[in-house]
Amino acid sequence: MTSSIPTSGEALPHYVSTAPFDPSLIEPNTSGMAAFSKASQLRLMWWQFRQHKVAVWSGAFLVLLYLSILISEFLAPYNLHTRNIEHIYAPPQGIHLFNDGKFVGPFVYGREMTLDMDNLRRVYRDVPTDIQPLRFFCKGDTYHFWGMFEGKTHLVCPAEGGEMFLLGTDRLGRDVLSRIIYGARISLTIGLLGVAMSFVLGIVIGGLAGYRGGTFDLIVQRIIEVLQSIPSIPLWLALAAIMPVTWSPILVYLGITIILGMLDWTGLARAVRSKLLALREEDYVLAAQLMGAGTPRIIGRHLIPGFMSHLIASATLTIPGMILGETALSFLGLGLRPPITSWGILLTEARSVSVIALYPWLLIPTIPVVLVILAFNFFGDGLRDAADPFR
């Protein structure tokens, strides 16, 4: 059997198609694959983040919490400094819906106070015949909404002529629930401001160290090592103790924010430096240099956006440390001071063992602190996993 030998220039009979390559012949071209191939980095992060259910619920909780601090005056049943002299160290009241088997609606029982002559303690007892229905969207204590205009409307109020202390009162007869709501405004915002300051310092210092290298990088690394070798709490205490006692509450607030922000930038700076050490040798950086771009433009426009998602996730995980730092300083009496109210200041009421034993509801402000810390940790873990390209 003989076979014809192709002449010079004749196409070989290989199984090769001259038609354009169509990827759909190999991979199914579904709508999901098409959307995935066209999705931006932020959309891909969102799709990955949605799979972390705990992080999604934590994020929703934090969003609602930060929205609530905008209307603290409306949510709180009483003003921040409203005193009820007849209800000092009153225990929490329970909300009831039924009385003698009949539906009445949300109400609290009235109370009467007697003095225990054995230990001189105030003893409060519910009066079952004194039913005090709760009022909603009602007129209560007068407040100045964000210091701009006067208002009287509250979400919930006690009955006319009655009292309502769902989380009890403190030694001055002030409602603990109202003070927790007002204190959230300080405790939550001081963490954001501190992180914003450390975010800027970490990006600027770490970016310059990683991009330029050399002596500047060496000096920055030694400074970071010295700062990280000092325990955080003693350093916070030392810096907080040097603030003059004559400062106004606003200046103290700003001072605590600066202290927390200036001492927490080291970890972020190292992360930025390590990223820029790897990215500064890329071709697009060389192209930007040849086109005459300066150092700030190259770092801010070309390098930082490449891993901004990682920076946001890292910053989110540092907010709980800021909140704990403010709470610890205020609890020890070296942070914020009255009349400013934060969760740390509320916990100063419970520094005595005898107070905790007799009035345990004064420890209730620890609950929102723990919930916020856990929510930020879960939310930050979700962001970090969503921003990780190797997952």
Predicted feature residues:
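Alpha-helical transmembrane segments of integral membrane proteins
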Residues: 169-391
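Gly/Trp-centered helix-boundary motif
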Residues: 1-199, 203, 208, 299, ...
